[in-house]
């Protein structure tokens, strides 16, 4: 069955097996997308992918078919990732305020420490290190085009950015990656 048929089965008949087929088809590409956005944090990847599939299942009736199911799913994944990043920023802001109040003699009881976003030090894949130098938008666009194979118009739909902006992010990101990799022994001098 194609994606539209599976979506129809899920939407109309709440067919969980049809949704399982969609999950099986898109789980690896979605995890790969998150793996690159999180710079190799496998646990976070799994959590973000699970959250994406939960949101996709609960909102599947809002899928209109104007774009491919994969584009719609990756758009949800993109939003899930940035919701996560936004929550980290809030946690970082709370930690900053709480550390200031601690410095000034206040209490921080009940506040959790912020989640570390640094990559695993044992990670030896140079591409993740190279991806760290990119801005979030550049990393997202590079991941969607180079690794996932999405064309510029689909990347624009997923990210909500104009196609020209996507092209700019891709150009800058590829240039920075090439320079980084060249400096670190890849390619010709």
Residues covered by each model-derived region:
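Sigma70-family region 2
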Residues: 12, 40, 53-68, 87-89
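Structural recognition of an alpha-helix C-terminal capping motif at a helix-to-coil junction
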Residues: 47-54, 67-79
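Internal acidic/polar
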Residues: 3-4, 91-124
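C-terminal edge and immediately downstream basic/flexible tail or linker adjoining helix-turn-helix-like DNA-binding
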Residues: 40, 126-129, 157-160, 174-189
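Helix-turn-helix DNA-binding module
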Residues: 129-140, 144, 148-165
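Amphipathic, Lys/Arg- and hydrophobic-enriched alpha-helical face
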Residues: 23-42, 59, 131, 183
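N-terminal module of bacterial RNA polymerase sigma factors
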Residues: 1-29, 179, 186-189
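Arg/Lys-rich amphipathic alpha helix in sigma70-family domain 2
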Residues: 62-64, 75-96
């Amino acid at each position: 069955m194609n994606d539209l048929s599976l979506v129809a089965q899920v939407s109309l008949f709440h067919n969980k097996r049809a949704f399982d087929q969609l999950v099986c088809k898109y789980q690896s590409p979605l995890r790969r997308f998150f793996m690159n956005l999180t710079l190799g944090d496998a646990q976070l990847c799994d959590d973000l992918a699970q959250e994406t599939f939960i949101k996709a299942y609960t909102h599947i009736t809002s899928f209109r078919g104007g774009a491919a199911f994969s584009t719609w799913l990756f758009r949800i994944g993109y939003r899930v990732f940035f919701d996560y990043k936004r929550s980290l920023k809030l946690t970082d802001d709370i930690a900053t305020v709480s550390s200031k109040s601690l410095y000034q003699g206040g209490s921080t009881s009940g506040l959790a420490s912020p989640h570390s976003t640094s990559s695993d030090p044992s990670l030896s894949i140079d591409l993740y290190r190279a991806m760290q130098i990119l801005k979030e938008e550049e990393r997202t666009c590079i991941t969607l085009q180079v690794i996932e194979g999405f064309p510029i118009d689909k990347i624009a739909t997923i990210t909500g950015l104009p196609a020209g902006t996507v092209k700019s992010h891709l150009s800058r990101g590829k240039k920075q990656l090439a320079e980084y990799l060249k400096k670190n022994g890849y390619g010709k001098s």
